[in-house]
Amino acid sequence: RLVQEGLAHAFFIGPNQKHHALLLRLQAEAQQHKVGIWSARGRVRDLKITTAHPADPTQDDQYPSYVRIANLSNATIKLAGYVLSNEGGQRCLFPDVSMDPGYTVIASSGSGTDGVAAKGQLVVHCSELAWDPSEDTAFLTNPSRSLVDTFHYKGKRVRGPSSRYKGKAR
């Protein structure tokens, strides 16, 4: 009901696709009718930075910093050529990976193999990106170098209620 009324967007993690078609159809209808978050007051984007999780310098943080980006469109988006950067000018060029509608990609500051992790989460490793633990801004640009979205955080880690990466959130 929330998706239908434009109060939420479709969001999927993992392989279970039981309700994907229904939720994407309801989202498309809400977008078409310009209700809720899809209204004229909002700036509709296909890709949105939803979470920033900088490392915590006061703890032995076993998980690397990351930024989560959601596909709010109703189509698969190829991320090849997109760039995620920060205020310090560090950049991460996305490889040739695709993100299905309603899914997210984790841009992790750790190292590893890019692709879908065991629990169905798409992960891209950007070891050249270091996020300032106190304040920073994430910038996402498309292959044409147009700004797609920004996400500024200040203070402690910024995350939504379901923004967890590898294990328990602190």
Predicted features along the sequence, with ranges:
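Small beta-barrel nucleic-acid-binding modules, primarily SNase/OB-fold domains
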Residues: 1-170
